[in-house]
A protein has these predicted regions:
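Serine residues within intrinsically disordered or low-complexity segments
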Residues: 3-4, 23-26, 49
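Bacterial N-terminal signal peptides
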Residues: 44-52
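Active-site helix/loop module of the DD-peptidase/beta-lactamase fold
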Residues: 122, 127-131, 143-186, 190, ...
């Protein structure tokens, strides 16, 4: 979620919404939370490619009766029958789902209500929360592939945030370090007293940061003399055909927004960006984001080298003792290797040689997820407008990519 300090350090270029709710207030805890999240997700992934085209519940049913595995269509019917009960038991108003097979959108579906009494549709616009970041990253990577900027040039030659003008570490900041969360910034500057600070030498540690994404967005905007959201439109959204996606409020938002749903005792928070935010608040439909994931899976618009770098772990965050524990729980003691860390725009996990790219998003009353397995051409995208949305997302992912351990760590 965006900083609560309007326009701090970005000359008003970035929309700032209400503060995100945190159970841990310190910047250190925020870093550790992000690291543990990355490691925990990667530690338990197991790939089941032969079962990835059917729902898990259909698979279990087939196993117990010794009958043949149902077709995708048969399994999907059973999947549809369960979604409404998942929404009800989790107190989540709606969920939008996309399933990708063979690097193509196999199907999309939307269930529930976008707002009280209004059914969600394929045109419902969901807040992406941090799923905004992969689109921002793809914009920068395509600009780099077109040689309009370099991933390794010093941002300081173009622009320095006023808060860090006197910090010599500011000269070390590059687009690559911003996209891989190695800037040394806190997630949001409100976590460091409302002032942007570099807490360690850039490139030496991983620390999840929305500020880093806004920093590289501001750099691209100044270097290319174009608003960042216009660059994203021209470089990513238009070429892919994402006609229902925007960083900022549009007239066509009217009547189409998925209203966030949180604890009943709390007043709803639903910030609408009036100026671009490279890390949060992008609005889109399930169909548009599914097309985006397919484009990423096909490496469209990128050089081969940059495509490879996007899917390469910059720093392994998995401790040996954690890997041993996860392998024991998964029953894979004899042959089990796990690495995980940030790529460029995505979290990258490699389990027993199989690579998975994924990212999630979390704002007040909003939970989102996108994941894909490049080697298998499989992907799943899920949006919800409920505080408990991850409960539904876990069930959806387990059904479409049937691995209970992976789904349980989301």
């Amino acid at each position: 979620m965006a900083s609560s300090r309007p326009g701090a350090g970005f000359d008003g270029a970035v929309a700032r919404g209400p503060p995100r709710r945190y159970s841990k207030k310190s910047a250190l805890n925020e870093i550790m939370k992000a690291r543990k999240w990355l490691a925990a997700k990667a530690l338990v992934v197991a790939v089941t490619s032969c079962l990835s085209m059917i729902p898990a519940m259909a698979y279990r049913k087939a196993q117990s009766t010794a009958r043949s595995v149902p077709t995708l269509e048969g399994g999907r019917a059973e999947f549809n029958a369960h979604v409404s009960e998942w929404l009800k038991e989790s107190d989540v108003p709606s969920v939008a789902v996309a399933y990708i097979r063979d690097r193509k959108v196999a199907w999309t579906e939307v269930y529930g209500e976008q707002s009280p009494g209004v059914a969600a549709t394929h045109h419902t616009l969901y807040n992406m929360a941090s799923l905004t970041k992969p689109i921002t990253a793809e914009t920068i990577l395509r600009l780099a592939s077109a040689k309009k900027l370099s991933l390794d040039e010093s941002i300081s030659k173009i622009w320095i945030d006023p808060d860090i003008t006197d910090d010599p570490y500011s000269k070390l900041l590059t687009p690559r370090l911003c996209l891989s969360h190695q800037t040394g910034f806190a997630n949001w500057r409100r976590m460091t007293g409302g002032v942007l600070k570099i807490r360690w030498k850039p490139g030496t540690q991983t620390g999840y940061s929305g500020e880093g994404y806004n920093y590289v967005g501001a750099f691209a905007e100044r270097k290319l003399a174009r608003p960042f959201d216009a660059l994203a439109q021209e470089t990513v959204l238009d070429p892919i055909g994402m006609k229902e996606t925007s960083y900022t409020a549009k007239d066509w938002y009217s009547g189409r927004l998925a209203v966030p749903h949180g604890p009943k005792a709390e007043k709803p928070i639903d910030p609408i960006a009036t100026k671009w935010n490279a890390a949060d608040l992008l609005r889109t439909t399930i169909g548009d984001y599914a097309k985006f994931v397919v484009s990423v899976m096909r490496d469209e618009g990128l050089t081969a080298a940059i495509a490879a770098e996007r899917a390469t772990i910059t720093r392994d965050t998995v401790k040996p003792e954690d890997m041993e524990k996860a392998c024991r729980e998964a029953g894979e003691l004899s042959q089990c290797t796990v690495t995980a860390g940030m790529g460029l725009g995505w979290e990258v996990e490699v389990v027993n040689g199989v690579k998975i790219l994924n990212h999630d998003g979390s704002d007040w009353g909003v939970r989102t997820l996108a994941m894909f397995v490049p080697s298998q051409g499989i992907g799943v995208v899920v949006f919800t407008n409920g505080e408990n949305g991850m409960r539904v997302i876990r069930k959806v992912v387990e059904a479409l990519y049937p691995n209970k351990l992976y789904a349980a760590t989301i």
